[in-house]
Amino acid sequence: EEELDNRDGFRWSPDGKNIAYWQSDTRNVGTFYMINNVDSNYSRPIPLPYPKVGTANSSVKVGVIPAAGGKTKWFNVPGDPRNNYIARMDYIPGSDEVMIQQLNRLQNTNTVWVGNSKTMALKNILTDKDEAFLDIHDNIEWLDHATAFTWTSEKDGWLRLYKVSRDGKTMQLITRGNFDVVN
């Protein structure tokens, strides 16, 4: 999804034995034409599936496949995949767990899931909301041997840094004051 600045579609597990990846189904998504006018004397249209406002989005899901080959197992992330984006996904260091950020189509709710790549069980550990808009969270740093991670949120009007336990049960404010944290 280019609007979410995703430039690749896979993540290696920490032990190198599995690959988690996005699968995007663009059926029913309208065609947008870009013009290629740089590689020859005559321009040509390049068809791309691209949703416009109010039209069908691509349906995206996350799967895990053994690096040696085999059958893909799929996470069953709740919600209509055409009305939610899988905005970010990465393995948690030293584990078989994948952290998935699911952004709703209005882009004002970011639901964070931790999925076990062996059992495919999902657990919601964090939900960040804003009345208007949320930026994608790209600042995750794993702390304390991957028992906690950093999270930024504007939930009180300022962009603040938090330390969140891996299970999402505790969220500790790190930065205080009337200023935004900048990365």
Give the location of each predicted region.
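Short glycine-/Asp-/Thr-/Trp-enriched loop segments that recur within the blades
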Residues: 1-7, 80-86, 130-137, 178-183
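Predominantly five- to eight-bladed beta-propeller fold
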Residues: 1-11, 18-75
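Beta-strand C-termini and the immediately following turn/loop, strongest in propeller blades
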Residues: 9-11, 20-26, 52-56, 90-93, ...
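Beta-rich, blade/repeat-based domains predominating
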Residues: 62, 87-91, 139-141
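Long hydrophobic segments that form regular secondary structure
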Residues: 67, 71-104
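Beta-propeller fold detector
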Residues: 73-76, 122-127, 171-176
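Short catalytic/ligand-binding loop motif for oxyanion handling, primarily in non-cytosolic enzymes
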Residues: 27-31, 83, 160
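Beta-propeller blade signature
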Residues: 60-67, 112-120, 163-167
